[in-house]
Each structure stands twice: as C-alpha cells, then as structure tokens.
C-alpha cells in the first residue's frame, strides 16, 4: 500500500506541473520532472513494461528500469506542449551524467535522463547518432523498423502520395544547325525577327523538338522506382514535369496529379522536391551549415502533427515508446533542433566532412562526390516525402552509391515515401534495391512496372540480357539502334531493328501495360488519403524565423568573405589618404569663388569615390544568385527575406567604412570645422554608400549575367554622373533631358554635400564684389540650389532612392528567372542527308587508301584511322592482342591494332610517394596539433605500355590526388618520393609533351564548337611532321570513336547553362586529350556522369588507345562488370591514401577475388556479383573494424607487394642503349604558330559572344546618342571659361565612361578563359605569351568598330570642328583610350584571384584615375608631391590629348570670372597646364599605356597561378 506521505507529495508534484502549464522554459520543465521523480513511487504495471514481467529477484537493472518507468510517468504528467519537447536520453554507466548504470551478468544496463530536445548540445547529438546509427545502412534499417513499429502499434495511418501522369507531351521550338550558334550575326537576326514578330511578321525558321511524347504512368508510395534511359531520352524533363518545375516557355499538355489533385490545387514545391544533377551551393559554407540552413527553411512539415496524434493514441492505449525512437521523433519534429541534420549527415556518409567548406572553382572544399551527396542531403533534411532525384550518383563509387540508395530505400519502405530516381550506371546490386523500373527512350516510356517483369517483357520482344551483364546496362542499350542487335535471341528469324514506337506498342499489349492502363482509367479516391499528405500553404516556417535564419546566413557569408571587405576597407583608407594629401587643407583657401570651385571639386571626388565603392556589390550579388534561384524555386523563403538581410547585414561594414573615410578626409581636406557639419557630411557619405549598394544590387537582379550586369552598371553610373549637375549645370541641360537630372541620385548627393559645406559661417560671412555671400555665389556658379533646406531634402531623397532600389531588387528576385537554360542543338541535315555525307567521308578515306596502297578495301569493312595512317605512313606495331567482351558490346568490330601516329611507348614507375598539405584551420580548431595532413602514404607502383590500369578506392581515398601528383598537376602541398619515366627521373617540361590528362571537371572554352575544340588541341599538340590534312582526318576519326560526329558543330557552352550535356562534355574532354596522340594518358573518372552505353563507348575508345601500345591510367568510381574487366591491372587505395591491392585483375577478375577471399573473415563473392563493388564492400572501413584487420598492413606483408616493389625497381633503371626524353623545344609548335592558333580560337570565341561584343557596341551606341543629345552642339557655345569647362567635361565623360565600361565587361570574359588557360597550359599546349598576345590582338578590331561608331555619332552631334586633323586626333585618342581601358581590365583579372577582388581593385583605380585626370583639380593646383602621379595617370593623358587636339590652336576670346578676357590657347595653358605643341608626345604615351597594360597582363598570366590543386 502506498505511503500517504508519498501520495500527498505526488499530488503536490502534479499540481506544480499543472501550475506551470503555460511556461515553456526547458529548465522549469526539468525542475518539475526532477521533483516528480523524487517523490513518485514505482508503478507496478509501468515497471513491468520496462523490466519485463518476471518473478526473479530485483537486480540493478530492474532498479534502472523502475527509474525509467518513473520518468515516463512523470513525462506523461507534463502539459502536451512540454511533453512533446522533452525526451529521455540514455546515459552510460560510467558517465558523469545524471543517469545511473549497472553491470550484471556480462551486460551493461543504462539509465535515461530527461532532456529538452530543442537544446540538445553538440556532444549529445553526436553521441546519440554514433550510438544509434553506428553502421549507417544496417542500424538505419533497424531503427526505422522500430520507428515504424511504434506508429503501427498506435494504429496511425501514414500520409502517402501517389503521383499519376496521363498523356504528358513536352516540346520546344528551337533553331537547328549552325543557325543555333550564338554568333553576332545570328543574335542580330534573332533580335530583328523578334521585333518583326511583334508586328505579326514571322520569318524565324525553327524546328519542333519533341522531348516527351504522350507519356503516362504511376509513381507509387512505398516503392522505389528507378528511371532509366539513354542520354537525351527526356529523363530530366520528365522529373521536372512531375515536380511541377518545367520551364514555362516549353509547350506542354497532359495531366499530372498527386492523390488526384492537379498541380494547381496544392503547392507542389512544398509537397515534392526535385534534386538536380547540378550541384549549386554556397562555396563559403560548410556542409553542416548548408544542411542546417536547408532544414530551418523547410521546417518540420507535418512531423509535429503526426507526433501529437501519436502521443495522444499512445496515452490512450497506455503504451510507452522506445526512448531512442521517441527522442529522435521529438527532436526532428520541433523547429530549432539539428538532430535531423546529424542523422542525414550520417546515413549519407557526410559526417566526416561536416565541418569542411563546400568550396568552388578557386576555393578548395569537399570532393565532387561529396557535393553530389550534399545536393541530395539538402532536400532529405526537410519533411518532403515525394522526391524526384536526377542522377544523384554521379562521381560516387558504387559502394557509396549502394549505401545511399539502400538508406533511401529504407526511408521509402518504412516511411511510405514516393521516390523516382534516375541513375546512369546502376550496378546490379543497386538495381536490385528498386521495386519498379521506368524505361524512357526517345521521349517515350518503353516499360513501366515491377523490376521482376522487365526481362520477361524484352524476351517476348526477342531480346535477352546475357550473363555477366547488368540488367540496367542491358535496358539502356536494348533500344539503341547501334547496340540492339547483339541481344537478339530469335535465331529462327532474321534480326531487324525494333524501334522505340514498336516497343511502346508491344508494352501496351503486355500484361503490365494493360494493368497500368486499367489503373489509370480508375479515378483516384481522394477520400482515402491522409489530410496532411499534400501541402496547401506556401509558408511552412514563420516569416520572423526565416528572416532570422537568412540574417544568420548572410552574416556567416560576410565573415567567410571577410577578405573582400577588409580589402575594400584598406583600399578605401588608401584612397582617403591620397585624396587628403591632394586636397590638403594647408594648400586650400576660402578667399574667392575659384577657391570655392576647388572645394566643390573635392566634394565631387568624395561623392564619386563613395559611389564607386558600391561597384563590388555587382559581382557579390551575381555570385549569390544561382543558389538563391534554387532556394526560391524550392520555396525555402520569400525573395524579400533574402534581400532584406542582404541590406541589413552590410550596414555595419558600410557605416564603419563611412566613419573611417570621413575621419581621414574631413578635417585633413579642410572642410567646415563645425561638429554638426562633420556629422551631416558623414550622414550623406553613409546614405550615398547605401544608395550605391542598392543600385548595383538591383542592376545585378535585373540583368543576371555578368557582362550585361557590368554594362548596365556602367550605364547607370554614366547617366547619374553626366546628369548629376556637376559636369553639366542644370541650366545647361537640354530640356528633353531635365527629367533625368531630377532622377539622378547623384544630383541630391551633390546638393547635400555642397549645401552642407557652403552654408558654413566661413563661406557665408564673406562677400563677393557684387554683394552676394561667397557661399551663395559658389553654389550659384556650381548650379546648386542656395536654400539651406535643400540639404535635408537631398538627404531624404537619397534615403528614398535606397529604399526604392532595394524594393526593386526584391521584385526582380521575385519575378525574374535565371538567364540561360540547357539547350539542345539539332543537326540541320535529315537522316538521309547525314548518310549521304557519311558516305562521302568514307569515300574520301577510301580514295586516300587506294592511292597509297595496292590492297583493295572491302566496301563492308570498318574503316578506322588506325588503318588509314598505317597505310599512309607504312608504320605498324605488333603487340599482343587481348579480347574483351565489351569492345564488341555495341555490335561493332574492334578497330585494327596499330599505332595511329608514330610515338614512343613509355612506362612510368614511382616509389614511396607521400603527399602532405598544410593542416586545415578547421581541424586545428578542433584540437589537432600536427602541422601537416598526409593524403598519400608510401605508394609504389608502375604503369606500362599496352596495359590499362584502374585506380580505384572509395570517395576520399586519394585517387585524384595521386594522379595529380604523378602528372605534375599539383600547385601546392609537399611531395616526397621518386617518379621515373622509362627509367629516367621525370622532367615535367618534357613529360607534358608526351602525356595527356582528362580532368574530372570538364573545362572547355564555352564559345567554340566540338570540332573546333579538337582541332585546336590537335594542331597545337601534334608534331610539326604531321601535316594539316592528317590532323583533320585524325580529329574526325577521334570524334567518330567517341561518338561526337553528330555534335561536331554544337557549341560547347557552360555546364548547366547551355550547350553540351554532362556526358557529351565528358566525351569531349577525353577526345581533346586523345587527339594529342600522347604516350601516357591519365583519366580522372572518365565514365563519371555517363550512362552505361556512353561509358561503354568511352571505354571502347580507351581500350583501343591502350591496344596501340599507350600507357593509360583511369580512376573509376562505379564500373559495371564489363567496364571493370576491360582493365588489365588494378591499384586499389583506402582512405588515407594507402595501397591495399596492386596487381593484375585476371580473367573474370579472378586474381582480385582470390586475393581478398584469402584474407581471413572475408566472405566469398556471390554468383554474378560485380567484383568491383564486392571488392570495395569487403575492403571498406566497416569491414576493417569488423574483421579487426588493416588491409594496408596486410598488403605490405604480402608477396604481391614484394612483386610490385621488384617491378618498380626494375623499371626505375633505363634499358641499355636508351636515351632520356628530349625535345628541341618545349612546345610542339613554334611561338608564332601557337599565337596563330590561339588567335583563331579567340576569334571564334569573340564572334560567338554576343552578350559581350554586341552589348558593348550597344553601350557605345547608346552612350554616343545620349551624350550627343545632352551636349547637343556644345562646341558652338564658347563664350566664357564656364562654357569651355562644360565642353571639356563633355569630352571627358564621353571617352571615360566607354573606357570604364570596356574595362568592366572584359573581366568576366577573361576570367572564364583563364580557367581554360590553366588546363591547356598544364597540358603543354602553348606558353602564356602567345595566349595572352592572342587575347590582346583579338580585342583590336572590336574596339576599332566601337570607336568608329562612337566618334561618328559624338563628333558631329557635339559640333566639334570638322577638320581632318582634329577628327583624326579625336578618333586616335578615343581608340587608344578604349583599348588601354580594355587591357587594364584584363590586367586586373590577371593579378586577382577572382572577379570580386578584380572589381574592387578596378573601382579603386577608377577613382584615382578620376582624381588625377586634371579635370576635377587642374595640374597647376595639384600639390607638388602628387604631380608625379598625374604624369602616370593614363586618363590625364587622354584629357590632355582631347583638349589640346580640339582647342590648342583656338585664338578666340572668352570671359573669365574675376579676370580680363583671355584667348582660349593661353587660358588652357595657364588653367590646365597644357602645352598645345605637346600632342605628339601625348599620342606616343597613350600608345605606350596600351602596350604597358597588355604586357602586364601577359606577364601576370604567365607568372601568377590562382588555381589551387
């Protein structure tokens, strides 16, 4: 019987709990729980639940169970709100935590302690994940079964979604053939056709591209569905259509429903998630930060409602849940907890890189495979249960892919999710994880249904999958015209090609097709679905929380980009110091109007400097847009919650910069000394910076591409600059432009600065001869309103512009989409035309052979370049043959053996290779004390001619690192060890000539075609002895080998934006190296991102290359059986860069299998299992732990290691009579030929860059017309010195802003090409000087055209004197000014690590160019200690040349305030310090600046390397 005192205390405890029901503070809850536990007796039935009903004597474990029962009972008494946020966490027996443990009969007993799930500490979360999901794939399944059992026990129905689609058609209208190339001519035609289209005239010749044709099907919940199909079959389009994310410009028809609801009846972006094949992330954030942000934006969805319902049912049924399941469900159901992130990190294998930044092109971060997993994880951390996953395994090894797909399968089966996954090369064991298969080909569904029936269907059609052939690989090849015949099994019938429409018709008659049609004909029963299955609200997280989350992210990104802001601040300080010493107080006076104009000039300079300081926001904002668009499309947040933090977070840095600037310049320059005016001046500087940042942000948001944004930014500054009232006073502005004066923010900044200064007592207490106050007179001369109230009006206007620009920025983010979509280039010829052309090509090759050789050529034989060149050169090689099943896998005859072009077979040996990098700061901050991190450890091996070597290992094992080290591509780190080429120490300069490297990232010049890319590589890298005709034949044959012939005229494009698809780019990367005819080829994941058929094509090419006697090494991630067994030898690495196997594969991989099966504890390989996948599985880190063995140590003690070391020793000595590699020159081609070829490529690049060249020509045209109308006939109005200053201002603005624009817009073009340059230079194609010279020369014709357009408009409209000499000089000065500004922009990029730094650096020098141009402060007024810089300022020489060439000989008289009338010629000499007879020197100096900037660009591109490898 219970003790009465206990009963009273229990009642008191319960009363206390209810009294605090409204309080949600975790500490209060814990305090109440503690009191309840101290006073509560054990409940017999509850205790029995935990300890198990038994008559045995109570033990320590029973006491612990009683304690847990008491805690559950106490939890049940909490208010619902607190109860759903409090869980029980296990505490180890030896921990110092609250829990108490005991050990008995060999078992460890655990107690639990209560925790607030919202405030779980990092250590608690990590301990929970480590304990519950120790071996991710096994423990995840066990845990999810327990979670599902809890839900089923309570009788809760899980919300599910069934996706149906009926008769979906998608098509696009596009140009075909060369008309699709983005040349200047084609784009001009497009613009003309669009304008004519507006008036109903349609001359555009477009072709309909059918992407999806009448597809229907069902994606069911609780079933894993695999989407397969060859490239360009429409897989991505189907996934986008089902997710409701299709481009609105596409023509679509048909119906897509979720549980019977159309896409317009709910919010598909919140219900379903499309996981893209493109990895778009903020490179500055760590993996965990990226996922935390995603989780906070997506919220918890219906998880909290499900938990409430579950807790209610369990309370009614008297069920107590498993503490770990309960804690997990509670922690993942409340906002603010990050346990969901920790869980996803663990099951996707990202926990080991959780604190590593993602990285980008110039910032080292996680690997490509890890980025791919991060893209998947970003959506898995959310509550979405409908997932459309597009090629999520690219770049992952098969073992990792298997683990991820298995974890997703567990989530699907246990959580009743709806998932459709497209994979490129699923291994057989991965294929087995799927329940259903959907096969897409040519935009039509060939099969959809259970995996078990797919082979039955194709056998009925007459095709069978061979043994040791993956079913997925078979499915992707069986519909292909080139691959189908090998699978034909109806020997009694002659084979004929079965087309895709025939397969579709046969499927409709197949029993699965009939079943599918029947199910689609029955409407979905909406009454049976769970109410929360679909999401009907666009907002799942409160606006305030989203705002806080976005602010935190912006602040984090700002800290990670601190270099940019520090650089900007330091630059501002330097410019402020320079400006202070130019406008030095001791040199300035306040005596008359001339002195006032100097102060006005100083204020204008302050204004322009702070205006230009916002220019960096252009590139910073543009860099953020791709990630924003992705988040916006997922409805992570509203656009304004991205824009507002962007503004708010930058306010402190802007305020700091403003204070620093004003503190340095204000009193040093000698502005009005009153404190109030100091702070008013500071306010205007700050508001001006905010306005400028807002202006450049909205420019980036509206334009969205780098070149157009930079051009628009320059245009905006030009309009504000010219119409701001300080170059051309308001009264002198033509009436048709006065509106722009009032719309220019610089107008108000100019008024505010001038009014604040000139209304100070030191100006207002003095008078000019006509009786006006000096301050008023200066303001009138400057065209500024004299009423002092204008200061506040102008400051308010700046605030208004700031708000307006930021609102417009938000609207642009809300309504505009990113520019550029993936495009398809259709060949213009029909099939028959293609066949005719193909016949001509073959006839041409036959003709060559017939001329050179007496042997007849069979009309049915396969003509390969191997044979052609053998016959042409009489050169052949006899090497041992080897047959491989995959070579004929596509029904082709293997090419004849032989050397395509003469070359020397070479082998490579390496001994004890170690590679270290400096310890990352993230690891040092976690307590790691070592200074270096070892990535490769004691690797030895050899690569030999005619032997194809696979370099394998799990993600992060160091495969790419080893290849970079051996090929000499590493730019940092510390390398130890010996590398030999045919027995001689490796010399990188000669090695680059005989080697090729296919990088994992497909980096190519975006604006040239496929064939042009190959011609460029071949003509630069093949020896001079090979004539041009042979090179072209060779290129065409390589294109045919890698099946790029149909795409030879397709533009390469930028990844994910336009041009080639991922797999097409991969094949191009390989072809670019193959046309160089190298002796040793490194290939970094050549089949990554390819489907099985494309991978087979690539591997056929690789095998053919090896068979010619070359040495080829490939890293490979997910090889099918066919591909894996095409290799001869294997070098297998484990994490940490250690070798665990180095030797031959053997027939059917038997040697590898035998080696690992001989290790104690390793399970035997299953029948038909892929040896590559099995090998990675049995040698994984988890296997090492389970078997208690170190595979690296086992290998080092094996006879295989001894044989490898012996081979390395043998091959490290040169053969007798051999010579080391020698080339008379470093490069294959002469410097002049390199220049010609680089110029050829640059010419096509520029011709096909309308966003650069058309835009800048348009800018020049617009600027010319605008300035011509603003300064209309200004050359005729020359009565006073004020008129002359306006004329000079017009010329200054006219030339300067086109120059600035050229400098800004060339930078992104050069930056993109610089990335390609790094790859091509590393490949030994050319030296830096010819490349740079070609880039310099190709600009000249475009700048010339720009200058012609500009001067022919500006010169007559401004009414300058029409004499040949004066026009020539105006043209000459303009041309060289535009040219040196262009080269200055190129130089800026060459000395900067990225575009952001280049833009900040550029803005600083634009400011200094302005300051010392001689316009704002004439040379005679510049302090003598700064005159030297005046002579070094290129813009000063431009202004000098413009003024002297136009007015150096004018003898007319003009009025000068306060002085007698003067002639123009002596006035120019006295006021500006210009000598009219100095024009020849000016011309030479302008040409000299052009050469200097071009040379500096070339020198910098040669010596500086910002690539990190």
Curated annotation (Swiss-Prot):
Residue ranges of domain ABC transmembrane type-2 in the record: 545-758, 1233-1447
SUPFAM superfamilies, alphabetized: P-loop containing nucleoside triphosphate hydrolases
Function: May be a general defense protein.
UniProt subcellular location: Membrane
Membrane topology type: Multi-pass membrane protein
CDD domains assigned to the protein according to its UniProt record, in alphabetical order: ABCG_PDR_domain1, ABCG_PDR_domain2
Principal localisation: membrane
Entry keyword annotation includes ATP-binding: yes
Residues annotated to bind ATP 1: 229-236
Keywords: ATP-binding, Membrane, Nucleotide-binding, Repeat, Transmembrane, Transmembrane helix, Transport
Residues that span the membrane, as ranges: 563-583, 598-618, 651-671, 682-702, 707-727, 733-753, 791-811, 1252-1272, 1284-1304, 1336-1356, 1367-1387, 1397-1417, 1425-1445, 1478-1498
Any GO MF annotation of the entry: ABC-type transporter activity
Boundaries of every ABC transporter domain copy: 196-467, 908-1160
Family as reported in the entry's similarity comment: Belongs to the ABC transporter superfamily. ABCG family. PDR (TC 3.A.1.205) subfamily.
Residues bound to ATP 2: 953-960
Protein name per the record: ABC transporter G family member 38
Cellular component annotations (GO), alphabetically ordered: plasma membrane
SMART domains: AAA
Pfam families with a match to the protein in the record: ABC2_membrane, ABC2_membrane_7, ABC_tran, ABC_trans_N, PDR_assoc
């Amino acid at each position: 019987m219970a003790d009465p005192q206990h009963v009273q205390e229990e009642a008191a405890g319960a009363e206390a709990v209810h009294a605090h029901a409204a309080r949600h503070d975790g500490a209060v809850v814990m305090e109440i729980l503690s009191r309840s536990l101290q006073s509560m007796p054990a409940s017999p039935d509850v205790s029995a639940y935990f300890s198990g009903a038994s008559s045995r004597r109570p033990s320590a474990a029973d006491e612990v169970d009683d304690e847990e029962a008491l805690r559950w009972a106490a939890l049940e008494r909490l208010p619902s709100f607190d109860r759903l946020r409090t869980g029980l966490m296990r505490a180890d027996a030896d921990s110092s935590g609250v829990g108490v443990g005991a050990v008995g009969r060999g078992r460890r007993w655990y107690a639990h302690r209560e925790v607030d799930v919202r405030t779980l500490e990092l250590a608690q979360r990590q301990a929970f994940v480590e304990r519950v999901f120790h071996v991710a794939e096994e423990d995840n399944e066990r845990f999810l079964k327990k979670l599902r059992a809890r839900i089923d026990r309570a009788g809760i129905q899980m919300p599910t979604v069934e996706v149906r689609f009926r008769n979906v058609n998608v098509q696009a209208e596009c140009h075909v053939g060369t008309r699709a190339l983005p040349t200047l001519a084609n784009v001009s035609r497009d613009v003309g056709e669009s304008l004519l289209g507006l008036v109903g005239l349609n001359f555009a010749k477009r072709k309909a591209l059918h992407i999806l044709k009448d597809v229907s099907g069902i994606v069911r919940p609780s079933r894993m569905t695999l989407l397969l199909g060859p490239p360009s079959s429409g897989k991505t389009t189907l996934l986008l259509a089902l997710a409701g994310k299709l481009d609105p410009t596409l023509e679509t028809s048909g119906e897509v429903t979720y549980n019977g609801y159309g896409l317009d009846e709910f919010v598909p972006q919140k219900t379903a998630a499309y996981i893209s094949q493109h990895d778009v992330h903020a490179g500055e954030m760590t993996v965990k930060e990226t996922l935390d942000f995603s989780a906070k934006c997506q919220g918890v969805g219906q998880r909290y409602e499900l938990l409430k319902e579950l807790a209610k049912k369990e309370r009614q049924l008297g069920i107590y849940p498993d503490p770990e399941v309960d804690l997990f469900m509670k922690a993942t159901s409340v906002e603010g907890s990050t346990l969901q992130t920790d869980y996803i990190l663990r099951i996707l294998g990202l926990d080991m890189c959780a604190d590593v930044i993602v990285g980008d092109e110039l910032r080292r971060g996680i690997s490509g495979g890890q980025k791919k997993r991060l893209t998947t994880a970003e959506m898995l951390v959310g509550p979405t249960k409908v997932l459309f996953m597009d090629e999520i395994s690219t770049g992952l090894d098969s073992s990792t892919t298997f683990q991820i797909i298995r974890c997703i399968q567990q989530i699907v089966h246990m959580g009743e999710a709806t998932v459709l996954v497209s994979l490129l090369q699923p291994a057989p064991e991965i294929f087995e994880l799927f329940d259903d298969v959907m096969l897409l080909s040519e935009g039509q569904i060939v099969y959809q249904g259970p995996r078990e029936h797919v082979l039955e269907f194709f056998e009925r059609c007459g095709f069978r999958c061979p043994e040791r052939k993956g079913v997925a690989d078979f499915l992707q090849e069986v519909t292909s015209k080139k691959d189908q015949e090998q699978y034909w099994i109806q020997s009694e019938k002659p084979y004929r090609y079965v087309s895709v429409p025939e397969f579709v018709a046969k499927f409709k008659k197949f029993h699965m097709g009939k079943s599918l049609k029947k199910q689609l004909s029955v409407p979905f029963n909406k009454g049976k679905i769970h109410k929360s299955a679909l999401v009907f609200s666009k907002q799942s997280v409160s606006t305030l929380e989203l705002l806080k989350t976005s602010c935190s992210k912006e602040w984090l990104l700002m800290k990670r980009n601190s270099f940019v802001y520090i650089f900007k601040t330091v630059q501002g300080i330097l410019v402020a110091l320079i400006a202070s010493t130019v406008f030095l107080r001791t040199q300035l006076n306040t005596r008359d109007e001339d002195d006032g104009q100097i102060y006005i000039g100083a204020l204008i300079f302050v204004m322009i400097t702070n205006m230009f300081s916002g220019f960096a926001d252009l590139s910073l904002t543009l860099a953020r847009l791709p990630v924003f668009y992705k988040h916006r499309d997922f409805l992570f947040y509203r656009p304004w919650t991205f824009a507002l933090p962007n503004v708010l977070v930058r306010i402190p840095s802007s305020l700091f910069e403003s204070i620093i600037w004003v503190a340095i310049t204000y009193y040093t320059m000698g502005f009005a000394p009153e404190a109030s005016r100091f702070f008013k001046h500071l306010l205007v500087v700050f508001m001006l910076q905010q306005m400028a940042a807002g202006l450049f942000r909205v420019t980036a948001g509206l334009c969205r591409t780098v070149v157009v944004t930079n051009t628009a930014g320059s245009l905006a500054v030009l309009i504000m600059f010219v119409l701001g009232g300080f170059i051309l006073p308001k009264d002198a502005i033509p009436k048709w432009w006065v509106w722009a004066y009032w719309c220019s923010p610089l107008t108000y900044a100019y008024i505010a600065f001038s009014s604040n200064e000139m209304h100070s007592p030191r100006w207002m207490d003095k008078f000019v001869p006509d009786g006006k106050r000096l301050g008023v007179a200066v303001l009138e001369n400057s065209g500024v309103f004299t009423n002092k109230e204008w200061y506040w009006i102008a400051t308010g206007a700046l605030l208004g512009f700031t708000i307006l620009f930021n609102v417009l920025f938000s609207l642009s983010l809300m309504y505009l989409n990113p520019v550029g979509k993936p495009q398809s280039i259709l060949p213009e010829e029909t099939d028959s035309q293609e066949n005719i052309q193909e016949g001509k090509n073959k006839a041409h090759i036959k003709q060559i052979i017939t001329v050179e050789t007496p042997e007849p050529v069979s009309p049915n034989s396969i003509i390969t370049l191997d044979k052609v060149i053998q016959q042409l050169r009489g050169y052949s090689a006899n090497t041992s043959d080897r047959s491989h099943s995959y070579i004929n896998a596509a029904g082709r005859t293997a090419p004849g053996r032989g050397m395509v072009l003469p070359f020397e077979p070479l082998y490579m040996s390496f001994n004890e290779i170690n590679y270290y990098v400096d310890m990352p700061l993230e690891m040092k901050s976690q307590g790691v004390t070592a200074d270096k991190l070892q990535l490769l450890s004691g690797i030895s091996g050899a690569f030999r001619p005619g032997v194809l070597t696979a370099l394998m290992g799990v993600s992060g094992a160091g495969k790419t690192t080893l290849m970079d080290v051996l090929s000499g591509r590493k730019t940092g780190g510390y390398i130890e060890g010996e590398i030999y080429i045919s027995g001689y120490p490796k010399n990188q300069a000669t090695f680059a000539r005989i080697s090729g490297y296919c990088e994992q990232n497909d980096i190519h010049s975006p604006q040239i075609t496929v064939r042009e890319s190959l011609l460029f590589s071949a003509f630069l890298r093949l020896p001079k002895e090979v004539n041009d005709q042979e090179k072209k034949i060779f290129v065409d044959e390589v294109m045919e080998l890698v099946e790029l012939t149909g795409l030879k005229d397709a533009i390469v494009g930028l990844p994910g934006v336009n041009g080639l698809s991922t797999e097409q780019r991969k094949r191009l990367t390989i072809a670019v190296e193959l046309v160089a005819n190298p002796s040793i080829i490194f290939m970094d994941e050549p089949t990554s991102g390819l489907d099985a058929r494309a991978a087979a094509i690539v591997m056929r090419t690789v095998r053919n290359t090896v068979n010619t006697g070359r040495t080829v090494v490939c890293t490979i991630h997910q090889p099918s059986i066919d591909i894996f067994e095409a290799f001869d030898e294997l070098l297998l690495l484990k994490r940490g860069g250690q070798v665990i196997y180095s030797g031959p594969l053997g027939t059917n991989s038997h040697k590898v299998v035998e080696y690992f099966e001989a290790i104690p504890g390793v399970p035997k390989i299953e029948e038909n299992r892929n040896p590559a996948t099995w090998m990675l599985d049995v040698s994984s880190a988890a296997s090492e732990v389970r078997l208690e063995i170190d595979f690296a140590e086992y290998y080092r003690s094996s006879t295989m290691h001894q044989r490898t070391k012996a081979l390395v020793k043998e091959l490290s000595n040169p053969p007798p009579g051999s010579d080391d590699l020698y080339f008379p020159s470093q490069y294959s081609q002469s410097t002049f030929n390199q220049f010609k070829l680089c110029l050829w490529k640059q010419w096509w690049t520029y011709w096909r860059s309308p966003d650069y060249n058309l835009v800048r020509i348009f800018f020049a045209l617009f600027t010319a017309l605008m300035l011509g109308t603003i300064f209309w006939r200004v050359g005729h109005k020359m009565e006073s010195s004020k008129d002359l200053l306006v004329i000079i201002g017009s010329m200054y603005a006219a030339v300067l802003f086109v120059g600035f624009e050229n400098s800004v817009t060339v930078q992104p073009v050069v930056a993109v090409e610089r990335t390609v340059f790094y790859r091509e230079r590393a490949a030994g194609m050319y030296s830096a000087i010819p490349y740079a010279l070609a880039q310099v020369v190709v600009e000249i014709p475009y700048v010339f055209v720009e200058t012609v357009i500009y001067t022919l408009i500006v010169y007559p409209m401004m009414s300058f004197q029409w004499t040949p000499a004066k026009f020539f000089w105006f043209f000459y000065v303009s041309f060289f000014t535009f040219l040196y500004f262009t080269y200055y922009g190129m130089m800026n990029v060459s000395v900067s690590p990225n575009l952001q730094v280049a833009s900040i650096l550029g803005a600083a020098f634009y400011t200094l160019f302005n300051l010392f141009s001689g316009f704002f402060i004439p040379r005679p007024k510049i302090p003598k200690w700064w005159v030297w810089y005046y002579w070094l300022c290129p813009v000063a020489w431009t202004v000098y040349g413009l003024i002297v060439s136009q007015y150096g000989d004018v003898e007319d008289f003009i009025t000068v305030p306060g002085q007698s009338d003067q002639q123009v010629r002596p006035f120019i000499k006295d006021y500006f310090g210009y000598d009219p007879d100095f024009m020849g020197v000016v011309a030479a100096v302008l040409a000299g600046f052009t050469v200097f900037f071009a040379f500096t660009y070339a020198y910098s591109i040669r010596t500086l390397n910002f690539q990190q490898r």
